[in-house]
């Protein structure tokens, strides 16, 4: 494990990546994350369901992009800690030659990802870059060293847009990355919304605990990020309903998390 990242890990303040891992039943968290994670569950018991369902949504999205849409390059921004059904595993199971670039700057996520996130095929490429979500120009510049930006790319913002300080920042981050991609690329994202007052309260309390602020937004604000893009079938809606089938646990359960997938014309 890279010592430079181990030394940067803060165990005195909570991390959204580690709390998310706690909610998903993982082991990569510290006591401060467990305390905040358990307190969050008391405020919004649905958050554990959101954690599981968001991962299932990601898997369905990647299978669609690698399969029907024939995308062979993926840029997963704000990926967090490795867990089940990681993007490269799903993509390379469909298309062995898939290239996947993960973006995050959480030290523990970087430490674990570089140790665990390896291509599952000889033909595929899997890389993990240390970039700040708030620096889209840097993300594009570093991703260009691995991905071919003259060919379509599947760009993913899975449950991270709330880290944007303002609505304008959120749109700027997404648009800067998407503007660098060619026609035929896809934007895939989801986020929690203000439909649930419990979720809004959870985000407020998380910020008070010392974590990096997370700002829930309305459905309309999240949907507006897709303006100018063409939604694929299923459109924009609850992540539990997006191209879902009855075989998944908790299928069609209503939660206040919305997203979709859209093609860049």
Regions found by a protein language model. Give the residues of each.
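Short alpha-helix
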Residues: 213-236
